Amino acid sequence: HLGAHLARPITGGEGGKVDGDALRCPFHDWRWDGETGKCVYIPYAKRIPENARTRAWPVVERGGLIMVWHGPEGEEPGFDLPTLEEFDGDAYTVVYRNAVDQKSTPLDMGENSVDLAHFVTVHGLTEYPKPEDTTITSEGERLCISGPSDSPRAQELPFDLVLDRQFFGLGFVTIRFLGIPGTNPLLLITTTPLDERNCVTRWTFFANKETADTIGVMFTEQLMQGVIPDFPIWEHKVFVPRPILCDGDGPIAEYRRWARQFYPESAWS
């Protein structure tokens, strides 16, 4: 009620918490009903103000994850999130899970997948990827990017490793690693914006149970080592609404045309 951030921790303490069916503020311990947004408890008040209310956001649960929709103009969500067999079936298990505070945006992180040239300078590929080897298609909220692995280690493998990336909006991304004999691991990336320049990214890596102790662990180690070099660049880069692109940059323009639907037009000016 006095402007505290319900997601960020306060100094020496924790952030907002779910308490029963309410969200508890870390600043004054007010409780807000999760369905209506109405204040239902103030520990030091005799009477709850009638207008004590915060906005309630559309929420769905998928595979143990709570996903919240935040539309650019306050609109309701126009699509649903997929149900993944890796979540709900018995064949796969979680090998790795982590949450990282980043000074970045969901837009920048997604654009990393189609910024082909940086895989040489930042990640150590020996040759620049060919744009024609990466396919990108979109329909509504969904974007599909498929192409060879961008990891230098993949060049040493005895098989061709293909990354199949599926975006469902900007905050829910799956990456399937195709071509590995006997398994197709899955990486789920979910991103929660905290403000215009900061977010929390959660990485969940699934492998089928038969290979979890071998391929799953190996891929997890290589995956995080491959992402770490991007962090300082994301932290210090600025958003360029109309970048000057060359023919070897990759499908950045196509990615941005798809991503515009999730932002107000003022964000691109």
Give the predicted meaning of each segment.
Residues H1-F87:
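Rieske [2Fe-2S] iron-sulfur-binding domain
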Residues G74-S269:
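C-terminal catalytic domain of Rieske-type non-heme iron oxygenases
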